């Protein structure tokens, strides 16, 4: 266990996790918490947001010992009655018959009475377990829309089309922002150099994008293709560009067999969505050093600004592969995520124990469906209440590329409502090109929606700075800001900080919606003034995003 303790120190986890000595293998602890009458709970995993708040009628099992649900997860639940439950380690959370039951692999499970409201409980938990770093991610994430080449180019990323994609955004009146170049820019997984067959002058491409006003991020993952030069170098020490054998001390990749004397002896072939590959062991200094060295080289050689870190799913670390450090799967996954802390312009999608940190976290891929549009809102609310202040929705219209292929059941109305939902939630991300998939009328709505977003951009930047100090979510539940009004189950609208109420249309074909107006005086986008608390009905023609500014 000395190796595990050393890893915790290396990762600078501080009080986020108990010393591994308190989590002996094979021993479990159980804690059951009875719900109070009318109590509501949030937490455990962002992906479960649509089922939140949990109450006496909930029947669910959330097992974050084996699955992170491809997003943020933590053994933390918080209630609107001022209570929270916390465990440093991963747990299985069963919610049934009006009770929460948490089971850990030995780590203590605490119930804390912190106050009387959701906000009081959250703030107390934040101070005790995931204090804010005081730092923000790159403020460019909040200052303008983001753009990702995934939907348009998928597995065919190339220099010419990337430049054309970026230029099309400017030509159609959208501002430059962060541009993410997605998977297959590289020669291979782990072979982190631009594919020379598709990128004649990658450094020149990045320079052109910079002159256009974009910041450039490259897609990265922790996998190493087992037929790449990188794999041969990491496993044998042979540099494929020469006959020189380099000094390699091992520890780069997860091992396949527990009985192997050294994990490097037989790297595991890990199945993921692009086949089978070796997986970098971030619990070993060599694995971390090699991966970070590749990132630093890309910045130095090509001038890129940061990275879109993908592929950090917990399930890749729960299959019995051998790591250098004898730590739980969550810490193995977290060790990869911690790489993001070295790069302020970085996006991540999976997180355990990284609440309070200056990392932009994206929601898991959403489908091109109305149900998943609604799920974007509930998951953003849930992730914020797990302690992730800087959350980005998935791509506008959804991140499942097959939905945008010719002949697919594309829904232009859904695309517009998705664009509106994202416009005022702090960050928005285009991938499918509006100029390809929409007609002229809907393209105009997109431009107007982005213009609206840009009017609020300075406020979003200031809100991000404030949340870096307080640890609070940028995007907030009504119950968080206005306790005692019965807002716990309102989850189709949200607040940005305490100043902006946003109520997007989330139903297909609907031309009006109900909006819950909390206490205060609110100036609506249509020029009316509404005094809360009250509930109103507002028209939602295709071009309207209902929002209310607090005075």
PLM regions with names:
Residues 125-156, 176, 183:
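An acidic-aromatic substrate-binding cleft motif
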């Amino acid at each position: 266990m000395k190796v595990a303790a050393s890893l915790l120190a290396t990762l600078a986890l501080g009080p986020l996790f108990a010393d591994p000595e308190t989590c002996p293998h094979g021993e479990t602890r159980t804690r059951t918490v009875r719900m109070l009458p009318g109590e509501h709970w949030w937490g455990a995993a962002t992906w479960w947001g649509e089922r939140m708040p949990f109450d006496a009628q909930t029947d669910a099992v959330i097992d974050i010992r084996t699955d992170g649900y491809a997003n943020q997860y933590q053994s933390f639940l918080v209630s609107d009655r001022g209570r929270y439950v916390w465990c440093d380690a991963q747990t299985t959370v069963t919610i049934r018959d009006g009770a929460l039951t948490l089971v850990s692999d030995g780590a203590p499970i605490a119930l804390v009475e912190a106050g009387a409201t959701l906000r009081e409980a959250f703030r107390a938990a934040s101070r005790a377990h995931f204090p804010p770093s005081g730092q923000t991610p790159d403020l460019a994430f909040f200052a303008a829309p983001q753009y990702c080449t995934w939907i348009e180019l998928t597995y065919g990323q190339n220099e010419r089309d990337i430049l054309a994609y970026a230029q099309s955004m400017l030509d159609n009146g959208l501002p430059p922002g962060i541009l993410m170049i997605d998977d297959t820019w590289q020669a291979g997984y782990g072979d982190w150099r631009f594919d020379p067959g598709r990128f004649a002058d990658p450094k020149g491409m990045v320079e052109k994008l910079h002159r256009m006003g974009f910041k450039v991020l490259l897609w990265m993952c922790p996998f190493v293709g087992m037929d790449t030069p990188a794999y041969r170098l990491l496993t044998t020490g042979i540099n494929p560009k020469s006959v020189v054998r380099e000094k390699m001390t091992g520890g780069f990749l997860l091992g396949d067999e527990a009985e192997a004397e050294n994990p490097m002896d037989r790297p595991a072939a890990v199945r993921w969505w692009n086949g089978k590959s070796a997986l970098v062991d971030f619990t070993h200094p060599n694995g971390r050093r090699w991966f970070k060295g590749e990132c630093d080289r890309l910045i130095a050689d090509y001038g890129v600004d940061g990275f879109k870190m993908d592929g950090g799913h917990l399930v890749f670390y729960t299959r019995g592969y051998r790591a250098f450090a004898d730590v739980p799967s969550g810490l193995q996954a977290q060790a990869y995520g911690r790489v993001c802390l070295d790069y302020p312009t970085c996006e991540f999608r999976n997180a355990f124990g990284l609440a309070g940190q200056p990392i932009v976290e994206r929601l898991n891929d959403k489908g091109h469906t109305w149900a998943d549009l609604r799920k974007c809102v509930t998951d953003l609310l849930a992730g914020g209440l797990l302690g992730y202040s800087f959350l980005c929705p998935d791509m506008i219209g959804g991140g499942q590329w097959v939905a945008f292929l010719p002949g697919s059941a594309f829904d232009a109305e859904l695309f517009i409502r998705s664009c509106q939902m994202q416009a005022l939630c702090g960050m928005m991300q285009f991938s499918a090109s509006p100029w390809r998939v929409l007609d002229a009328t809907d393209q105009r709505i997109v431009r107007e929606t982005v213009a609206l977003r840009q009017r609020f951009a300075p406020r979003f930047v200031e809100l991000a700075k404030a949340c870096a100090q307080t640890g609070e979510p940028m995007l907030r539940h009504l119950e968080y800001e206005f306790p005692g009004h019965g807002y716990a189950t309102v989850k189709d609208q949200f607040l940005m900080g305490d100043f902006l109420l946003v109520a997007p249309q989330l139903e297909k074909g609907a031309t009006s919606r109900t909006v819950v107006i909390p206490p205060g005086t609110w100036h609506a986008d249509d020029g009316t003034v509404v005094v809360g608390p009250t509930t109103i009905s507002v028209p939602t023609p295709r071009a309207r995003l209902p929002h209310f500014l607090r005075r």
